[in-house]
Structures are given as structure tokens and as C-alpha cells.
């Protein structure tokens, strides 16, 4: 099954009923009113007893700055034309490979830089100063490199700040998409149906979506449904295994696939209702080291941890 977003005016009564498969919502948009606040709180909580405490606190400062930038720099767009075009082409409406960026993302970056400068250590201030002095052309090249996963083209010290601005920009746009999501037969469920990016991790929900697994986009923050008995990367079902650092009851596990040799974190709200897709993934890097030691490659990217040059 693949997921496609359809404009509301193209949904008749019959197709409206068909926007979910077995009453399963195929797509969940982020609640921006609480997303960054919740992520900040979770990062701060996880930092209390973690060998990566300093970096988790650093990430929390970035998410706090994202929350402020979201409030200070709202974005209002008419997404009808983009949605109609994407529905006709079968492409994600905010396809990161072709969607024309405006200067709004650079305004967000400037706001993040200004906010983070206040109490940042000297080595971070130096990075922020370099970004602040960069030309529009340079910043757009950095953005292109990150979105195209050409990480050698941008220093890993700059990447989290550029991505934080891009992600907030894409999340703001995604929150204004007026269509409905519909599950259809097809492939490529490893990519976000909203923007075409990849997941940071997956979350097994409680509440209304109890027991359902959703992949969380590392760019636009949307979540899309993928069944739990299928590899989120290659869609095979033959050789899936689950790994944890603690016990079988651990809230954070890694789902590995013997077919494609990759793994993705899977977070269980039933075990810990406070798990958060980005924060808990970042705080469990020891599990990543274990998976790499077992010969598996990570199929996702955390927005605070990009591959080095």
C-alpha cells in the first residue's frame, strides 16, 4: 500500500469513506502547537541520566528556538494548486527534490541563529557566525546538499542548524495542506508521502491509533502508517528481528531486516507514553552502535546527527 494526498474537492462521498484502510488513518500531520515543546521537554528529561547529556541539552536548545521561530514567523500559503498538481502527478505535494523554496526558510534560520547565540559556547557561536555571514547562494547550496543527502558538501557542524530551519519551514507548509490522505496499492512506503524525505524512527501509538506503527518524517514531521510485520525500508517480511539494550519490555528497540541489511528504531508508547520520535532516537545511540556491530546499516537520519564529511 502507498499513501496519496488528494484535494478535498476530488473526494466524493464514496472516496471519502475510502480515505482509510480498515479505518486506519494513513497519515497524521504534526500538531505544531505542541510538537517542539514536547520534544524539548523529552530531550531535557532524557539528558538527566544519559552519557550524551550535553548533546541532548544542545538539541533541546535548538527545539526551543524552533518553537520561538514558529511563533514569531508564521507562514500562510495557499496549497490548493500544489496539492492538485501533486495529485495528478502522483508526487508528494511538498516533494523536497523539486518544491521551490522561498526565502522564508532563511528567515527562520536567521531567527534560530539570533536566539541560539545568547548562551551558546564559543565553538557554537563561531558556527552560527559563519552561517550568519554566508551569502544567499551559499545557504541555498547548503540546503540543496542536505536535502539531496550530499553530506560531504556541508560540514556536519552546520547541518543541524540548516536542517532545523528547513524542517520548520516544511512543517509549517505541511500543516496547511487542505487535502485528505488515501491509502492505495503501491510501493515506496519508506518515503514520506508529504515531502518525500525519510523517517527518523517509527512509533507504535496508544490511544486512537492504539497498536499502529507510524514512521515519523525527519523533515516535515508528518507520520505515515506502515504495518508492523514489514520492513520499513524494503517492505520484505521474511527476516525481521528486534533488538534492545535492556529487556523485551524496552520502550526503544531496533527493527532489523536480514533482506536489505538495515534497521530502524521502533518506539513503543505502551511501554513509555512519553517516547518522542526524534528525542528517544537521539538518546539511544548506544543501540545504534550495537546494530552497526551486528552488521546492520541505519536506514534513517536524525535531524541532530548527520553523517560527517
UniProtKB/Swiss-Prot annotation:
SUPFAM superfamilies in the cross-refs: FdhE-like
Matching Pfam families: FdhE_C (PF24860), FdhE_central (PF24859), FdhE_N (PF04216)
Subcellular location, record wording: Cytoplasm
A Gene Ontology biological process term: protein maturation
Family matches, as InterPro entries: FdhE-like_sf, FdhE_C, FdhE_central, FdhE_N, Formate_DH_accessory
GO terms for MF: ferric iron binding
A single cellular component GO annotation: cytosol
Protein's UniProt keywords contain Cytoplasm: yes
UniProt KW keywords: Cytoplasm
PANTHER family: PROTEIN FDHE
Family per record: Belongs to the FdhE family.
Function: Necessary for formate dehydrogenase activity.
Identification of the protein by name: Protein FdhE homolog
Record organism: Yersinia enterocolitica serotype O:8 / biotype 1B (strain NCTC 13174 / 8081)
Record gene name: fdhE
Amino acid at each position: 500500500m502507498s499513501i496519496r494526498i488528494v484535494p478535498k474537492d476530488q473526494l466524493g462521498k464514496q472516496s471519502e469513506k475510502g480515505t482509510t484502510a480498515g479505518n486506519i488513518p494513513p497519515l497524521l500531520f504534526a500538531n505544531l502547537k505542541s510538537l517542539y515543546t514536547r520534544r524539548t521537554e523529552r530531550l531535557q528529561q532524557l539528558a538527566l541520566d544519559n552519557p550524551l547529556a550535553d548533546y541532548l541539552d544542545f538539541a533541546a536548545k535548538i527545539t526551543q528556538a524552533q518553537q520561538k521561530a514558529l511563533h514569531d514567523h508564521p507562514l500562510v500559503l495557499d496549497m490548493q494548486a500544489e496539492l492538485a498538481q501533486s495529485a495528478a502527478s502522483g508526487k508528494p505535494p511538498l516533494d523536497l527534490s523539486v518544491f521551490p523554496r522561498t526565502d522564508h526558510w532563511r528567515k527562520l534560520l536567521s531567527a534560530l541563529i539570533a536566539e541560539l547565540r545568547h548562551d551558546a559556547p564559543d565553538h557554537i557561536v563561531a558556527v552560527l557566525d559563519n552561517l550568519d555571514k554566508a551569502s544567499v547562494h551559499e545557504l541555498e547550496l547548503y540546503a540543496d546538499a542536505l536535502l539531496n543527502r550530499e553530506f560531504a558538501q556541508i560540514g556536519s557542524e552546520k547541518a543541524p542548524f540548516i536542517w532545523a530551519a528547513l524542517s520548520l519551514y516544511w512543517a509549517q507548509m505541511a500543516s496547511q495542506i487542505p487535502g485528505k490522505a488515501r491509502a492505495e496499492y503501491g510501493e515506496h512506503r519508506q518515503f514520506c508521502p508529504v515531502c518525500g524525505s525519510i523517517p527518523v524512527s517509527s512509533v507504535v501509538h496508544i490511544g486512537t491509533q492504539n497498536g499502529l506503527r507510524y514512521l515519523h518524517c525527519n523533515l516535515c514531521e508528518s507520520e505515515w502508517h506502515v504495518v508492523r510485520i514489514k520492513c520499513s525500508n524494503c517492505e520484505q517480511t521474511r527476516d525481521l528481528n528486534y533488538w534492545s539494550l535492556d529487556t523485551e519490555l524496552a520502550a526503544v528497540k531496533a527493527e532489523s531486516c536480514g533482506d536489505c541489511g538495515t534497521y530502524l528504531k521502533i518506539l513503543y508508547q505502551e511501554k513509555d507514553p512519553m517516547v518522542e520520535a526524534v528525542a528517544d532516537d537521539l538518546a539511544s545511540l548506544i543501540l545504534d552502535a550495537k546494530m552497526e556491530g551486528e552488521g546492520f546499516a541505519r536506514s534513517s537520519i536524525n535531524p541532530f546527527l548527520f553523517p560527517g564529511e
